[in-house]
Amino acid sequence: MMISEIRQELTDHIIPFWNKLRDDENGGFYGYLSYGLELDKKADKGVILHSRILWFYSNAYMTLGGDELLDNAKHAYEFIKNNCIDYEYGGVYWMMDFEGKPADTMKHTYNIAFAIYALSSYYRASGDKEALALAYRLFEDIEKNTLDEYGYREAFDRQWRLVDNEALSENGLKADKTMNAILHLIEAYTELYKADGNEKVADRLKFQLGQMRDIVYTPDTNALKVFFDTAFNLVGDIHSYGHDIEATWLMDRACDVLGDEDLKKQFAEMDLKISHNIQDIALEDGALNNERDKNEIDKTRVWWVQAEAVVGFINAYQHSGDEKFLESAKSVWENIKEYIIDKREGGEWYSEVTFDHTPHDYKETVGPWKCPYHNGRMCMEVITRGVDI
């Protein structure tokens, strides 16, 4: 039942919605659609948004087939290749204007990771070796420019001079390093290794997994720390429920793709503990709360957190056989259907909904961070994993 509903959500709602945002005049996809569903054709175009769109269409094509999906993937790829990559200094820009010229030339490890993730997927979908070469180019840019003695630094100007990491900091905190960036490096390097089996990529992926296991994970609480200074001293006291449940299945996937049996065993055990913890402390009224900051729980229902919860709980069920995880996945999907999916003509998913189910009307429908990657990926993961309820 759930698979057929989610397949229909992907094919009849999410894909048609994003198809309409293709910009054939200036390239790429339009960068902003308001909560009121007003399209701004002259809004800046986020590079993260475009990497996620490229990943989405590439994987939708590999999951469903269909020339239109591959054509839209190619359209996103051409925009990234021709506009977003800095061929002089390396990396990708942070933001383009509506015509495809650089609007913000900041370099960010997280942003470059998403470009690698997308280009690797596009190579797998299309066989275009130029896309794989660009993914490796960006991989080398990260490895050459962002490492210090402890790990990966995150925020730089165009010429790789360190700047404040405002893009991934929040709650009034400034962090030099974040769990979020490490997680999405793992995601990107997993996809690149899956595409081509390069051992240097495997070595760096194992290093990142080791950081998650040995530094970011807290065995006492079965939770992931969020913000750090340069030397990985903790900054703040935040627990991000969505990132925890997303990390469980992404780390399991990385170990599966690497084929390392010792790592698979270690992480399956750790990830199940994290999944149980999230189920116990964050699942409330059929949905996942957002985060804890010190002693305050933010109960906002954020679209991407709900999508990752469905995948994470299904993954935990597959590793444990515990039916409670399936029940949790089902409850979150039912909540998504009822309250997160925007049923207005021309809508997609609400960005955020309050605990009592009121959408936040100040949060856009499409923007630099609001994309088809989390909800689209949830649909594809449910379809390919084949676990039904």
Curated annotation (Swiss-Prot):
Catalysed transformations (reactions): D-cellobiose = beta-D-glucosyl-(1->4)-D-mannopyranose
EC class: isomerase
Keyword check for Transcription: no
Described function: Catalyzes the reversible epimerization of cellobiose to 4-O-beta-D-glucopyranosyl-D-mannose (Glc-Man).
Keywords: Isomerase
Name of the protein in question: Cellobiose 2-epimerase
One MF term in the entry's GO annotations: cellobiose epimerase activity
EC number: 5.1.3.11
Superkingdom, natural source: Bacteria
Biological process, per Gene Ontology: carbohydrate metabolic process
Gene3D superfamilies, per database record: 1.50.10.10
Keyword Isomerase in record: yes
Highest classification ranks of the organism: Bacteria, Bacillati, Bacillota, Clostridia, Eubacteriales
Family, similarity comment: Belongs to the cellobiose 2-epimerase family.
Pfam families in alphabetical order: GlcNAc_2-epim (PF07221)
